[in-house]
Amino acid sequence: MGCLQGKVAIVTGASTGMGQAIAIAMAAEGATLGLVARSAGPLEEAGSAARTEGGEVLTFPGDVADNELAKRVVRTMIERFGRIDFLVNNAGTNTPHRNLADMSVADWNQVFSTNITGAFLFTRHVLPHMRMAGKGQIINISSGAGLAPSAPAGVAYSASKHALHSLNDSINLEERRHGIRACVIAPGETDTPNLDLRPRPPAKEELAKMLRSEDIANAVIYVASQPDHVSVDMIVITPTAPRNYQADYERYVAEGHTRVSLD
């Protein structure tokens, strides 16, 4: 019997990369899942992969920053399964334009909408049900860019992930009295499809040195499997072999690819 047998979880950003790996790992441990992502086709593929591990999986295509979607997902999971034990706020995006001078208002808003507003909305809607149960876990997938500004990750992404760390701390500050725990997981460079959005995507030999999505999924299982009296507040995961990814960014700037435009 898996360590999450009988538990119910919502995972956002579940169609690819870390989110898909998290969904499959939680399903393998017995969890019933509600998966959320923008792209319906890849989301259904991820749902099918999770179903092969056993257990029931519902999929909800849509934008995590849509308040009505967040309400519908939570309502449906409660109506079908009667509980929500875990929320994994994994949905994240970035823009190819990383500098302040390069970034449009639309770029900024899109990154914050997905990376922090979505986490806020889903957290807001699961809280009443977790409070009623007297327990629950919210796991926020951040980044090393949430610990220190990262030029390769960009100003909007770094700022949004710092905000996610603050949201995590606020959840713990306000909700532990209700038995609700929050953990933020901050991975270093991880081989996911989001790397294709970098101004200079890493080469294959560089990808080989990075973390895998399954590494982050294993950390989620570790956090989710802790007893109710244990709170893991933060996990930082880094590749054993550090890579000079700052050099990618410096070459990109030196080649004159920044656009420096204002709305």
Functional labels for PLM-detected ranges:
Residues 29-46:
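Conserved glycine-rich Rossmann-like NAD(P)H-binding loop of the short-chain dehydrogenase/reductase
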Residues 8, 15-16:
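Conserved glycine-rich cofactor-binding loop
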Residues 98-100, 107-109:
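Substrate-binding pocket helix/loop in short-chain dehydrogenase/reductase
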Residues 123, 160:
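Active-site helix of classical SDR
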Residues 143:
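Residue(s) in the substrate-gating loop at a strand-loop-helix junction
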Residues 184-185, 200-245, 250:
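C-terminal helical subdomain
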Residues 41, 61-73, 105:
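The beta1-alpha1 cofactor-binding region of Rossmann-like NAD(H)/NADP(H)-dependent oxidoreductases
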